[in-house]
């Protein structure tokens, strides 16, 4: 988080707090409504991020600065406080991220250990697992080939994070341009096949988070229907 953004967010929330403290029920003008809306949005963000602040102190700081009154803290003191806040927040976020990564790795490994013993599940040397739902009889793609597929991706808890059903049309891409688990599985699939693949985190996105519901070290499940293969020239 950039220091200027932190400062702006704090100042913005302080301004809205000051306005609300003056007259909590008076939202007669567009300026009042805008101020309240900004304050509510910032307040929700602070709450969601676990940032603990004193609204009254923020309001006091805003009022002092806007009125030209003597500030209760020096510029250096405020800079030091904000720097410490930023470092503490980053440390907290890093600890939370690492904890989540460890938890996801343990859960994923436990899932794969149990899943490999289920009927029809094949385990490859890489750790990738798959189950054939429908066997096609078409050509198998190579790394440089282009495929058209329908798919649904979900987490091991069943949460769907992506699906061609949402877009209403299949996806087309080069086999080498997807996560390693997909690249490996697709090269084994004859066109026309439908497989369910179980992708260890190391063959998916690894320890990084790609946003949305996919966290670090997530084991992913995909149901893939390989519609067609376009061989590279």
From Swiss-Prot:
Chief location of this protein within or outside the cell: membrane
Homology family: Belongs to the FKBP-type PPIase family.
Annotated transmembrane regions: none
GO terms for biological process, alphabetical: protein folding
Function: Essential virulence factor associated with macrophage infectivity. Exhibits PPIase activity.
Annotated signal peptide: 1-20
Pfam families: FKBP_C, FKBP_N
Gene name per UniProt: mip
EC numbers for this chain: 5.2.1.8
Catalytic activity line of the entry: [protein]-peptidylproline (omega=180) = [protein]-peptidylproline (omega=0)
Domain of life: Bacteria
Enzyme class, first EC level, given as a word: isomerase
One GO location term (cellular component): cell outer membrane
Matching InterPro entries: INFPOTNTIATR, PPIase_dom_sf, PPIase_FKBP_dom, PPIase_FKBP_N, PPIase_FKBP_N_sf
The protein's name in its UniProt record: Outer membrane protein MIP
Keywords recorded for this protein, A-Z: Cell outer membrane, Isomerase, Membrane, Rotamase, Signal, Virulence
Family matches, as PANTHER family: FKBP-TYPE PEPTIDYL-PROLYL CIS-TRANS ISOMERASE FKPA (PTHR43811), FKBP-TYPE PEPTIDYL-PROLYL CIS-TRANS ISOMERASE FKPA-RELATED (PTHR43811:SF57)
GO molecular function, one term: peptidyl-prolyl cis-trans isomerase activity
Location in the cell: Cell outer membrane
Keyword Isomerase annotated: yes
Limits of the PPIase FKBP-type domain: 144-233
């Amino acid at each position: 988080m950039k220091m200027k953004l932190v400062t702006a967010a704090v100042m913005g929330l302080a301004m809205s707090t000051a306005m609300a403290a003056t007259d909590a029920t008076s939202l007669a003008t567009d300026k009042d409504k805008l101020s309240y809306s900004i304050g509510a949005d910032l307040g929700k963000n602070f709450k969601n991020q676990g940032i603990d602040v004193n609204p009254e102190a923020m309001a006091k700081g805003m009022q002092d600065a806007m009125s030209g009154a003597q500030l209760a803290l020096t510029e250096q003191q405020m800079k030091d406080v904000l720097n410490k806040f930023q470092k503490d927040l980053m440390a907290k976020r890093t600890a939370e991220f690492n904890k989540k990564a460890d938890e996801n790795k343990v859960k994923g490994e436990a899932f794969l250990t149990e899943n490999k013993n289920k009927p029809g599940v094949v385990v490859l040397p890489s750790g990738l697992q798959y189950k054939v739902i429908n066997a096609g009889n078409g050509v198998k793609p190579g790394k440089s080939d282009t495929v058209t597929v329908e798919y649904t991706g979900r987490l091991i808890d069943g949460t769907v994070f992506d699906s061609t059903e949402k877009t209403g049309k299949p996806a087309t891409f080069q086999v080498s341009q997807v996560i390693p688990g997909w690249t490996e599985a697709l090269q084994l699939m004859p066109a026309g096949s439908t497989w369910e693949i179980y992708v260890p985190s190391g063959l998916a996105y690894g320890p990084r988070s790609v946003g949305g519901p996919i966290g670090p070290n997530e084991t992913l499940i995909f149901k893939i229907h390989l519609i067609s293969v376009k061989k590279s020239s």
